[in-house]
A protein has these predicted regions:
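ATP-dependent adenylation/nucleotidyltransferase module used to activate substrates
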Residues: 2-214
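ATP/NTP-dependent adenylation/nucleotidyl-transfer catalytic domains that generate, transfer
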Residues: 2-8, 212-312
Length: 312
């Protein structure tokens, strides 16, 4: 168990110290499993950095990409070029949302909402009574929405294919997850540390103490290639590094966290930059009606946004 203060101290270390720390964790993981390990590689900037660090220490560790069909086109292209192994899920995103429901507003809340709608009376009561483990007031309306809500797409489209790959090849995974990403990730790190050797699904998170700025700084100073949809990495007005285009490139059609996006949000930018995917997402997949229901805009308004983008 890692104390909160220790985690915070480690997150404040300079990048060079974090690189040394990460390599140490990779070596421990590799040696513990006799080299039977792999990198879960998404083509995004975090796993691109980790791939670079791993290849520096152990060039033989394969980078494995799960081709879900949900990546930004440039991320998918970059991942297919740089992965050593490509795997695929059994279902498409369309089949997942038809079977389980839409991913909104966050992984944890979607899980609570699904349980509030479909579990035993006791669990339903727990999810609706208020407090830490219940549906927040802001998202109560999703409990009675005319569509299903679920956190399961990540499990079906990513975790399941990777677990099958792990079983078939008898390899243990390394991921680029960072504690900084969410309170759920923070709790995971404090409970398990970087290398979780025990438990049902052993996993290594050697970049757990990194933060977004470290990733951008690493890319900038090492000049490694990365997916084009991030644009350039520049210093913003506040002295922080930033991407000139997308700064997060998870699954293109995912609604988790859209409520925290600035303006234009991910769907408004998608309309501008990826009109074909936008039409499929909003109309064919029905994401438009979900966003309408929760009052989140998804139409791009050029003049207003372009002024805002220029001042960004």
């Amino acid at each position: 168990v890692i104390a909160y203060e220790v985690m915070k101290q480690r997150q404040q270390l300079p990048l060079e110290a974090k690189i040394v720390f990460t390599k140490k964790k990779i070596r421990e993981w590799y040696e513990h499993w006799g080299g039977d390990v792999y990198l879960s590689f998404s083509g995004g900037k975090d796993s691109t950095v980790l791939r670079d660090i791993i290849k520096d220490v152990y060039p033989d560790v394969p980078a494995v990409f799960c081709d879900t069909g949900l990546e930004y086109p440039e991320v998918r292209e970059f991942a297919l070029e740089n992965a050593d192994v490509v795997i695929k899920p059994e279902l498409t995103f369309k089949q997942v949302i038809e079977k389980y429901g839409y991913p909104i507003p966050s992984k944890e809340q979607a899980y609570f909402i699904r349980q509030a709608r479909h579990s035993t009376p006791r669990t339903k009561a727990l999810r609706l009574k208020g407090g830490r483990y219940s549906v927040s007031n802001k998202w109560r309306m999703l409990v009675t929405a005319p569509f299903e809500v679920s956190e399961k797409c990540c499990d079906v489209l990513k975790k399941k294919p990777f677990r099958k790959f792990e079983r078939d090849r008898e390899l243990k995974r390394i991921t680029a997850m960072m504690a900084d990403e969410s309170s759920l990730r923070e709790r995971q790190y404090m409970q398990r540390g970087c290398n979780a050797f025990n438990g049902k699904n052993p996993a290594s998170m050697p970049m757990a103490i990194w933060q977004e700025q470290d990733v951008l700084q690493y890319i900038k100073q090492s000049s490694i290639e990365y997916a084009k949809c991030y644009g350039e990495i520049i210093e913003g007005a506040n002295g922080q590094l930033m991407c000139t285009k997308e700064d997060k490139t998870g699954c293109m059609f995912c609604m988790f966290g859209v409520q925290y996006d600035g303006t234009p949000n991910r769907f408004q930018r998608m309309q501008r930059d990826y009109p074909k995917q936008y039409n499929y997402c909003i109309n064919t997949l029905g994401i438009g009606r979900v966003l309408n229901y929760v009052g989140i805009p998804y139409e791009y308004q050029p003049t207003l946004f372009d002024d805002m983008e220029e001042t960004k």
